[in-house]
Amino acid sequence: MDTELVEMLKQTGAVKFGDFTLSSGRKSTYYVDKYIFETNPVCLSVIGDRIAKLIPAGTRRLAGIEIGSIPLAAVASVKSGMPFVVVRKATKGYGTNKLIEGVWQKGEKVFVVEDVVTTARGALGAIHTLREAGLAVDEMVCVVDREEGGRESLEQEGVKVRSLVKSSELLGYKP
């Protein structure tokens, strides 16, 4: 368990308790507010360091998923020197009209960066987009794994999931 990061997420107020509806539609008694840890420079820097250390050998690009994991991919890119791309959920209808923004080449190995994994619907959509474009994705990282089936869904798609923190660690840790 990464005690420093668990404490940081709690101390910044990123872990909230109450009645919440998650993006999946599920109800929960706790919420991990990614915008709290993504907008705190100290927390973001620590997360970037952690992600940079997990980048698998042979990786050519990181991938951030619109909108939530873009700051995470950006800081990990800065910390590691590894370029990144942005994966959109849908084309904008103007400009370049791309689903994958940034520079990349078919066949490159990509390490997907995600904020919070619950059902993994967003991560799976991004992985399918990357694979359809000819990029190789077999590993990803998330800051928090809520341990609600997302990891298993990703593994069924052949994607190894690394998490910086698991919900059981967040909820069970007492300093």
UniProtKB/Swiss-Prot annotation:
Keywords: Glycosyltransferase, Magnesium, Pyrimidine biosynthesis, Transferase. GO terms for biological process: 'de novo' UMP biosynthetic process; pyrimidine nucleobase biosynthetic process. GO terms for molecular function: magnesium ion binding; orotate phosphoribosyltransferase activity. It catalyses: orotidine 5'-phosphate + diphosphate = orotate + 5-phospho-alpha-D-ribose 1-diphosphate. Pathway: Pyrimidine metabolism; UMP biosynthesis via de novo pathway; UMP from orotate: step 1/2. Its EC number is 2.4.2.10. Orotate binds at T118, R146. Its cofactor is Mg(2+). 5-phospho-alpha-D-ribose 1-diphosphate binds at R88, K89, K92, E114, D115, V116, V117, T118, T119, A120, R121, G122. Homodimer. Catalyzes the transfer of a ribosyl phosphate group from 5-phosphoribose 1-diphosphate to orotate, leading to the formation of orotidine monophosphate (OMP). Belongs to the purine/pyrimidine phosphoribosyltransferase family. PyrE subfamily. This is Orotate phosphoribosyltransferase. It comes from Methanocella arvoryzae (strain DSM 22066 / NBRC 105507 / MRE50). The lineage of its organism: Archaea, Methanobacteriati, Methanobacteriota, Stenosarchaea group, Methanomicrobia.
